[in-house]
Swiss-Prot record:
Organism: Human adenovirus C serotype 6
Job of this protein: Major capsid protein that self-associates to form 240 hexon trimers, each in the shape of a hexagon, building most of the pseudo T=25 capsid. Assembled into trimeric units with the help of the chaperone shutoff protein. Transported by pre-protein VI to the nucleus where it associates with other structural proteins to form an empty capsid. Might be involved, through its interaction with host dyneins, in the intracellular microtubule-dependent transport of incoming viral capsid to the nucleus.
Swiss-Prot/TrEMBL keywords: Capsid protein, Cytoplasmic inwards viral transport, Host nucleus, Host-virus interaction, Late protein, Microtubular inwards viral transport, T=25 icosahedral capsid protein, Virion, Virus entry into host cell
Family: Belongs to the adenoviridae hexon protein family.
Name of the protein in its database record: Hexon protein
Classification via Pfam families: Adeno_hexon (PF01065)
Amino acid sequence: AYNALAPKGAPNSCEWEQNETAQVDAQELDEEENEANEAQAREQEQAKKTHVYAQAPLSGIKITKEGLQIGTADATVAGAGKEIFADKTFQPEPQVGESQWNEADATAAGGRVLKKTTPMKPCYGSYARPTNSNGGQGVLWLTNGKLESQVEMQFFSTSTNATNEVNNIQPTVVLYSEDVNMETPDTHLSYKPKMGDKNAKVSLGQQAMPNRPNYIAFRDNFIGLMYYNSTGNMGVLAGQASQLNAVVDLQDRNTELSYQLLLDSIGDRTRYFSMWNQAVDSYDPDVRIIENHGTEDELPNYCFPLGGIGITDTFQAVKTTAANGDQGNTTWQKDSTFAERNEIGVGNNFAMEINLNANLWRNFLYSNIALYLPDKLKYNPTNVDISDNPNTYDHMKRVVAPGLVDCYINLGARWSLDYMDNVNPFNHHRNAGLRYRSMLLGNGRYVPFHIQVPQKFFAIKNLLL
C-alpha cells in the first residue's frame, strides 16, 4: 500500500530476467569436442535466468518443501505438536518482521516477492488491492472451479554451498512469489532508465514523486448570497427580518453553511458560546479541515537506505531433488533457472532513527485522528492488561492500527474520514465548542451533559448545534 516513508527510489521486492554469461565459453572447448557441444555452449550463453532482489523479514523455525514453519500446534488443541507452515495466500506478511533490534540471527527466513511478470515500480506510491479476506494481494485465477492466487515458493541457500553443490544443501530463505494488481494512483515516475516497460536490473533505480493536487472550486457556495438576501440564508423567521409575513424556504445545506461561516467570520457570536452554555459548531474550518489539537510526541522516526533494503546477502536458488518423492528427508540441489547471485536481505530493513515531513504529517494524523477514533477500531497492545471498562483512560488510549493513518494521503485536498463526521467522540475533539467545554470540565472524553439552548434562539438552534 501507499507508503510515504519509503525512499523515493526504493524498489519493491521483485524479480527480472537477464541474459546470463555462460560458465563455459565455446572458444575454450577442446578441439576434440563436437559441434553439438559448441552449439549447446552458445545456447547456454544466451540463456535467460531469473534474478532476485528482495527482503525476507520473517524469521521461522525451519524450511522444508512445504515452506517456512512459523509455529507448532498448541498442546490444548487437536493435532498437538503438528508443524504449522505459513499460509502462502497471505503469509509471510510483508509488514511483519523482527519485533526488536537485538533478536538472534535468523537461520530460516521468509518473505514475499513480486514475480517477473508484475511490472517493476518504486515502492513509494505502489498500491496493490487485497484479493482475499486475510489481506493477501495475489492475482486470482480460476483453478478447479474456484478463484485462487498462484503463489509459488522459491528456495535459496547460501551462494557458495549451492553453486558448488556440496552435500547437505539446506535452504535458508524461502520467498513466496506472486503477481499482484500493481497501481500507482498517487505518484508518477520522476526517473526511469531507458528500458521500456520490461523488468530489468536498471529498473531497480526508478524514482517516483507525488502527483500535483488539482484543486476544484465550489461554484455553489454563495449562490443566493451574491445576488440577494432572501432572509432564508439567515435561518430566522421570515417576519422578523423583512417585516412581511411571508415564508421563504431555506437554501440548500451547502449555501446555508457558507452563509453561516461568513456570519461567523464577521461577527463574534462564537466568542460567547460559553455564556449561553452552548457548543457552537465550527462548521468547515475546525470540523472539515484538520487542525492540530493533539500531542506530537507519539512515534519514533526512522530513515532508510536508498535501496529500501540495505545490507543483503548473496543467495543461489535451490530445488528439491525429484528422485526423493515424499519418502524420507528432502534433499536439495542447485536450481539453474535462477542466476547465481540473488541479493536478499534477511530480517528487518536496515534503518536509523527520521522523511521528516512525512513523519510530522503522520504524527499529526495519529495524534489528531487515530487517538480519537471509536474504541472498536482500537486494540490492546501485546502483553498489556487493559481495563474492559470503556470509560477508563487506559481503555480509551488503546493503540490504533497504523494503516488507519497511513492510508490518509495529503495531496493538498481538504477532506475528512467518515469517522470525523459521524462518530461522537471524534466530533467532540474536532468541534471548537465541545473542545472548550471539555477544557472546562476536565480532560475527559466521557462527560454526560445536556446542551442547553436559550429559547430566544429556538428558530436557529439546529444551525448552532
